[in-house]
A protein has these predicted regions:
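Short, extreme N-terminal leader segments that mark the start of a protein/domain
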Residues: 106-154
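Conserved hydrophobic/aromatic beta-strand scaffold that supports enzyme active sites
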Residues: 134, 182, 218-220
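Glycine-rich loop/turn
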Residues: 52, 58-62, 67-70, 140-198
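Conserved NAD+-utilizing ADP-ribose enzyme module
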Residues: 2-117, 122-125, 178, 190-293
Length: 293
């Protein structure tokens, strides 16, 4: 059975909104996802649960309703249904009303600054002009040599079952997630954290993220432009993701490389991308300052 509802959950018809007591009597199959709406640390998907943080809980904005709808539409595409849970029944009913009128909400404009995540102390939110993909120096060499960003499935060339069962899949992501290139907002630190985590083979500590911080290589894209990519998808969790591959020459805006990696990476960079490369010194005090350079 799925995790117990804290207050109210919407289940697909004919159940409708049920209470925690009613939920305890129900069973759910493995092809359903749970959307939990609340005041969490961040928005993320973890072990079959979409934790949707609201910037001003219990109020929910049109944009936030849009992202919930996008998540449901993406999951539906891959045969998964969604239940929705929220402590506040009024918030839940507002979201359900938005889902009924999804076409109106899917056109809600993206704010210039998203304040649901406040991990960045400088901007106090996510700046939405750009999205980026951050990677390690070894992976950057492979990317430059093939001229593309590739999904994990295409880059690794192993069965998807192998990717699903790896320890690095701590979030228990389903198979289709590995078919996409993941993109974060331009000033997001999550990509660098993940690169360090995989390099260290453990979660980075405060020292790793400050005086011991080693930034990855960042590939920046203009958000509005990349939305027009024929394989782009908005899944409600990330700003967007792109299926299979992104050809750099066609889409990349800037590539930011730590200066200390210049000698290693420059021989591998195609001439067609040289004018889009920026080298920066890592003279910042921590990971958050680095994302602002």
């Amino acid at each position: 059975m799925r995790a117990r509802c804290s207050a109210f959950r919407y289940c697909p018809s004919p159940l409708g909104i049920v209470t925690a007591e009613q939920l305890d009597k129900l069973d759910f199959d493995g092809d359903s996802m749970l959307i939990k709406i609340g005041d969490f640390e961040c928005t993320e998907v973890w072990d079959g649960v979409f934790y949707k943080k609201l910037s001003n809980y219990p109020e929910v904005s049109d944009w936030e309703i849009r992202t919930i709808i996008e998540f449901m539409e993406y999951e539906k595409k891959y045969g998964r249904t969604c239940d929705i849970e929220c402590d506040n029944e009024n918030t839940l009913r507002t979201v359900l009303d938005g889902i009924k009128r999804k076409e109106a909400y899917l056109s809600a404009p993206c704010p210039k600054l998203l304040t649901e995540c406040t991990a960045c102390p400088y901007r106090k939110g996510c700046v939405t002009d750009f999205v980026c993909h951050t990677t390690s120096v070894d992976n950057a060499i492979k990317i430059f040599e093939c001229g593309k960003l590739l999904s994990a499935l295409n880059a690794r060339q192993v069965p998807v079952e192998t990717l699903i069962n790896e320890n690095r899949n701590a979030a228990n992501d389903p198979a289709d997630y590995f078919e996409y290139i993941m993109l974060a907002w331009g000033n997001c630190q999550a990509g660098d954290r993940l690169v360090m985590e995989r390099s260290l083979e453990r979660f980075p500590n405060d020292n790793d993220l400050s005086i011991g911080f080693n930034p990855g290589v960042r590939f920046y894209f203009q958000y509005e432009k990349l939305l027009s990519h024929p394989s782009s998808v908005c899944d409600g969790v990330l700003p967007m993701k792109v299926k299979d591959e992104i050809i750099l020459e066609d889409w990349v805006y800037k590539i930011v490389i730590p200066t200390k990696l210049k000698a290693i990476l420059e021989p591998h960079i195609p001439n067609s991308l040289m004018d889009r490369v920026i080298y920066i010194d890592n003279d910042c005090k921590d990971i958050c300052a680095q994302t602002e350079t």
